[in-house]
């Protein structure tokens, strides 16, 4: 748990998703603070349109891969959809994820998961919350800053160690970050949180769904990745 204590005291947290040992080793050697084994692997690895086909076995498999590559780096792993529908099931699955090498699990939701999170924390499982856009539920949300603040405070009372704010906007991010005592992590939202999380394959420009201005900046920065591949192909084709 020393890894997590150090992470929680980091002023600006850089979190990046990862699913394999090679990239995990690369991230550990560079300045990434924490690796997220995200259920985004449903899209990036499996080629599905969403996260709904990711299983517990797959999260465990990829968590083990990442831990082999990054033995000293804090790892947070998503609890996939349908893996925390009861307290008993959630605790069993969370323990399996931690046994695979994770230091913390991430759970999407608010009122619907308060009891689950409280139960996990009481059983010494560290939990990262996730509100705003929640891919497992794929539902639209109202950007009411006071409602978001109330949800964040309730999750803090439940015992979460950190909180991901997904596409909630700068005003909401700032309000929550200033009014809770745990680190906040922004996803595609603002620079107003204690840190940011990004999908590795998007950073590398490998995703096919990079459409926003932010995404286009990522793609521009990643153009150099094509050079070694293109050079190899050109050498063979001479």
Question: Which ranges hold each PLM region?
Answer:
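Alpha/beta enzyme core
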Residues: 1-238
